[in-house]
C-alpha cells in the first residue's frame, strides 16, 4: 500500500485534521482492502433501483440526486461512477451525500477522486471523522479489567464519567500500564460488547465517532484494534465465551418481554446492543441471577 507515500501523507493529515493516521488507514483497509477491492456496480443503476424498490425510498432518492450533482460538479464522469451493491462510492465507501459534504481534493488535481487517488481517499476519511467530532489527542479506548464490583449495567454512551472514577472503582488496563493522565481526567464510557461473556473496554468519545462511520460496536472495535496493532499493540486479552442455545429469534423474544416490563432495550430486533445488554443486567440483578448482561439460555428460561 505504498508505505512511504501513505506514511508521509499521514503526517500531513494528522496535523490538518487531528485524526491519527492508523485510524484512517484501518478504515481504508476495512472498507476497500486498501483500495484493492472491486467496486463494480453502476452507482446510478443501484441508487435508482433502491429509490424505487427499497424500504427507505426517500433516503435513496436523496442519494440518487446527490450522485447526479457529483457528476454535475465535475468530480467524475457518469461512466466512472462506481459503487457497492448498496450505492456506497469509492475506496472509503461514502454515500453520495457524504461525498458532497466531506470528500477532499487532497492531491490538488481539481477533483475529489476517492476511486483512484490515495491522497484524496485518506484525507476524505480523516475529514469525515474530524467533522463527526473526533477529539484530537485522545485515544479511541482501552481494553480493561473490570471487577465484578463495577456493574455491566453502567455501560453505554449516555453513562460517561471521568476515567479516574473507573480507576477508583478498580478498573485497570489489561496491558498493566496506567491510563495516560490526560485520559484519566477526561470522560470515558464502559463498553462491554458481549457483557461479561467477552472483553471489556473503557471507550472514549472517539469510539462513538468511529461508529458514525459505521454504527456497529464491533466495527469500531475492529478499527481501533487494527490501528493499535499497526503501532505495535497486541491482541485482545479478554476471550469471547461461546454462548449456545440462543438464536436471534430468542433474543428478539427476550427483548419483547423486557419491553413489556417497561425496560428500554433499544428495539426488539434480535441484536443485543448496549441498551439490551444493560436491561438484561438490571433484570438479572433484580431477580437474584448472575449479572452477565448477555442473553443466555439460562436467562431465556427466566423470561419465558
Named regions from a protein language model:
Residues 15, 20-26, 78-83, 109-113, ...:
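Surface-exposed patches in mature extracellular/periplasmic domains of secreted proteins
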Residues 78, 85-90, 95-212, 220, ...:
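Flexible, glycine-rich surface segments
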Residues 32-41, 53-57, 73-79, 93, ...:
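Secretory-pathway/luminal and periplasmic proteins that interact with or process carbohydrate-rich
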Amino acid at each position: 500500500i505504498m508505505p512511504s507515500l501513505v506514511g508521509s501523507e499521514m503526517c500531513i493529515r494528522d496535523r490538518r485534521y487531528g485524526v491519527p493516521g492508523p485510524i484512517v488507514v484501518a478504515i481504508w483497509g476495512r472498507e476497500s482492502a486498501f483500495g484493492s477491492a472491486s467496486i463494480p456496480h453502476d452507482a446510478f443503476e443501484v441508487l435508482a433501483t433502491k429509490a424505487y424498490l427499497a424500504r427507505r425510498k426517500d433516503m435513496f432518492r436523496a442519494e440518487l440526486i446527490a450522485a447526479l450533482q457529483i457528476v454535475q460538479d465535475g468530480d467524475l464522469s457518469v461512466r466512472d461512477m462506481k459503487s457497492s451493491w448498496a450505492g456506497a462510492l469509492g475506496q472509503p465507501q461514502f454515500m453520495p451525500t457524504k461525498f458532497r459534504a466531506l470528500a477532499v481534493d487532497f492531491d490538488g488535481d481539481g477533483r475529489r477522486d476517492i476511486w483512484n487517488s490515495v491522497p484524496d481517499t485518506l484525507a476524505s476519511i480523516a475529514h469525515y471523522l474530524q467533522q463527526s467530532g473526533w477529539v484530537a489527542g485522545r485515544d479511541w479506548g482501552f481494553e480493561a479489567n473490570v471487577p465484578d464490583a463495577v456493574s455491566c449495567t453502567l455501560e453505554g454512551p449516555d453513562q460517561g464519567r471521568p476515567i479516574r472514577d473507573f480507576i477508583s472503582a478498580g478498573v485497570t488496563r489489561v496491558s498493566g500500564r496506567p491510563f495516560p493522565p490526560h485520559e484519566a481526567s477526561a470522560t470515558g464510557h464502559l463498553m462491554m460488547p458481549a457483557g461479561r461473556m467477552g472483553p471489556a473496554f473503557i471507550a472514549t468519545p472517539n469510539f462513538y465517532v468511529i461508529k458514525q462511520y459505521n454504527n456497529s460496536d464491533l466495527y469500531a472495535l475492529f478499527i481501533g484494534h487494527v490501528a493499535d496493532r499497526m503501532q505495535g499493540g497486541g491482541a485482545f486479552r479478554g476471550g469471547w465465551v461461546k454462548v449456545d442455545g440462543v438464536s436471534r429469534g430468542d433474543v428478539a423474544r427476550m427483548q419483547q418481554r423486557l419491553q413489556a416490563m417497561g425496560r428500554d432495550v433499544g428495539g426488539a430486533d434480535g441484536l443485543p446492543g448496549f441498551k439490551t445488554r444493560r436491561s438484561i443486567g438490571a433484570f438479572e440483578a433484580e431477580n437474584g441471577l448472575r449479572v452477565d448482561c448477555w442473553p443466555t439460555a439460562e436467562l431465556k428460561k427466566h423470561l419465558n
